[in-house]
Amino acid sequence: MKVKYIKYDETQCFSSTVIRYLNKDQKIAPFINQFPDLAAFKNIIKNRNFTGDRSILVDILLQQYQNIENQPEAIKANISYLKSNKTFTITTGHQLNIFTGPLYFVFKIVTTINLAKDLKKKFPEHNFVPVYWMATEDHDFEEINHTYLAGKKITWKKGRLSAVVAPVPSGLPDP
């Protein structure tokens, strides 16, 4: 099978800001904490200063998971790890948009799990718990009611009830 690597900027699917971030452009360095690489994780671990009460989070998670049957041991272990100040979460999330589909969710989740495993190998004295956060209620409809396709903005102008109730589209044909 022939495989060709396509650079992000060649896809014309990412903003110039995203391209600069991925290319570690020093012009944007003042606006971010760290570029994503192993050296950055070493600095983050070294400079962490979180002092919150972890037991509150652990207790709530244990309550939420108590009625789930046949839980994998990894879930129980990860919740337990959160008690320790030697534990970090590796968090990803997703805000709804039109062109990602279910495979993108799976990709993000698997990538986060793999990063947590890789960091555990690199920093064995720490634990890394993968967290997937579904950004379903943190946005305004105006943030997700449009997309760009072939240089044109396509907007869904009607049909918003609330962040937690599905919008009812008007003017669209029945399936």
Question: Predicted segment positions?
Answer:
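N-terminal targeting/trafficking signals and adjacent low-complexity tails
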Residues: M1-P175
